[in-house]
Amino acid sequence: MSAVPNAVIPNPDNLSVSAPEKLSGFEWWRRSLQYRTGMGLDPQEKAQFEFDYQHKYLPQQCNSCIEFRDWMLTYSPSVTFMMDHIKKLSPNKEQILNKSNIICDVCDDLKGGGFHPQEGILLCANRIQSKWQLEDILTHELVHVYDHLKFQVNLNDLKHHACTEIRASMLSGECRIFNEIKKTGLGDFGKKFQSCIKRRAILSVSANPICKDSEEAEKVVNSVWQSCFNDTRPFERVYR
């Protein structure tokens, strides 16, 4: 969908839920189709649909997120493996993560999750579409926790930030080849895994307030790429 000239991006704080007749039946189907195709959709309508969608499905999304989280904490090989290694690095060898600080909530941005050293892990319920996507996101954030404990990551050092982002995208499974083929087709097959990791790392570093721009982020990622891409700890190798 092409940009609308001089369009004003709506402020989500000024939106309210549409009338009930617009949230079900044929009208909801029509709006959903319009959103997917972008045909005849202006920025205001796009923002309104996204607002309505989150309102319509948020309780279901939050419940699903909690259900998926609990399942992964018990049965996911990558999640339980990372949790065990985080416990080994924790003070007094006690588990510092549990259901009280791995939380599901609503996020305003497009991220699937986040980690804060004092608060724990956030899983963005309104951005998670499946159990397996949550597994990737949770594993990604657990790699950040592991790196924080083992390497004392300082996010004010862009090289530190780049390295933990490279490792998290590499080890979480979110850049597995099948995912990339679905997104970008079969072209450059042999480079898809590394390209995905670099792309994600550059985006994350670009969002760091001390990073000037994406060009600086790319330079930093490239400068630490070799050492960080080859560091699969605590895994013996990349298996997801």
Swiss-Prot record:
Family named by the database record: Belongs to the peptidase M76 family.
A Gene Ontology biological process term: mitochondrial proton-transporting ATP synthase complex assembly
Keyword set, alphabetical order: Hydrolase, Membrane, Metal-binding, Metalloprotease, Mitochondrion, Mitochondrion inner membrane, Protease
Cellular component, GO annotation: mitochondrial inner membrane
UniProt name for this protein: Mitochondrial inner membrane protease ATP23
Cellular location(s): Mitochondrion inner membrane
Organism: Scheffersomyces stipitis (strain ATCC 58785 / CBS 6054 / NBRC 10063 / NRRL Y-11545) (Yeast)
E.C. number: 3.4.24.-
Main EC class the enzyme belongs to: hydrolase
Function: Has a dual role in the assembly of mitochondrial ATPase. Acts as a protease that removes N-terminal residues of mitochondrial ATPase CF(0) subunit 6 at the intermembrane space side. Also involved in the correct assembly of the membrane-embedded ATPase CF(0) particle, probably mediating association of subunit 6 with the subunit 9 ring.
InterPro entries recorded: Peptidase_M76_ATP23 (IPR019165)
GO molecular function terms attached to this record: metal ion binding; metalloendopeptidase activity
Membrane topology, from the record: Peripheral membrane protein
Principal place of residence: mitochondrion
